[in-house]
């Protein structure tokens, strides 16, 4: 597993790591960026990422809540792998049609795993968790591919959400720099 994990980390890094000047969702500026659309649009890489996420799905959840936009392909493929239904959470309700915040069915009474792509401060996880809870869902867990280590784990915990990442920024950088990504699991 360690070698497979190292290889996957290196693939994610080489596919999606960019350098330059980037403004993050949190408003922070960074000199590097993980372009999640690069790994989410590669079917083989996305499949391997999701296969690595499957064992991280906590027991007791009965639905996956993919956050707009990057969490949607992850939740869709994770749904196909686990058999759990997927729900798609908008940043704000549509202003036409069903005018729903959450698509895919009623989440009232469901125990949902929030699925996100890249997390820095967990701001969107917190907002979406609050929205899902207002719709009657129970949310105690979130899962992401990359934790940029910007305090998101602590912010999510303060909201009562345990956030797990497939990789931290440090692990991805280690896969590039030292050819290894430590296995935290």
Regions found by a protein language model. Name each.
Residues 60-70, 143-144:
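Short glycine-rich phosphate-binding loop at a beta-alpha junction
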Residues 2-11, 131-185:
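PRPP-dependent phosphoribosyltransferase catalytic core
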Residues 62, 110, 140:
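Conserved acidic residues
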Residues 1-56:
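Active-site-facing substrate-recognition patch
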Residues 35, 114-116, 121-122, 141:
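Thr-Gly-centered strand-to-loop micro-motif
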Residues 74-113, 121-127, 179-184:
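Short, glycine/charge-rich flexible loops or terminal/linker lids adjacent to PRPP-binding catalytic cores
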Residues 51-62, 129-135:
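Phosphate/pyrophosphate-binding loops at sites that engage ATP/ADP/AMP, CoA/4′-phosphopantetheine
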């Amino acid at each position: 597993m360690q070698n497979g994990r190292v290889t996957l980390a290196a693939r994610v890094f080489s596919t999606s790591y960019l350098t330059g000047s980037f403004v993050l969702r949190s408003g922070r500026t960074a000199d590097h960026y993980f372009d999640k659309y690069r790994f989410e649009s590669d079917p083989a890489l996305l499949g391997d990422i999701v296969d690595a996420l499957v064992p991280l799905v906590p027991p007791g959840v009965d639905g996956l809540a993919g956050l707009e936009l990057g969490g949607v392909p992850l939740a869709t493929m994770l749904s196909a792998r686990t058999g759990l239904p997927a729900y798609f959470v908008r940043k704000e309700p549509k202003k036409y049609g069903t005018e729903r915040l959450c698509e895919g069915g009623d989440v009232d009474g469901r125990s949902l795993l929030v699925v996100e792509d890249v997390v820095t401060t967990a701001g969107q996880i917190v907002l979406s968790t609050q929205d899902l809870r207002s719709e009657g869902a129970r949310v105690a867990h979130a899962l992401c591919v990359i934790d940029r280590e910007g305090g998101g784990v602590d912010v999510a915990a303060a909201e009562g959400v345990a956030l797990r990442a497939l990789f931290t920024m440090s692990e991805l950088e280690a896969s590039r720099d030292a050819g290894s990504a430590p296995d935290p699991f």
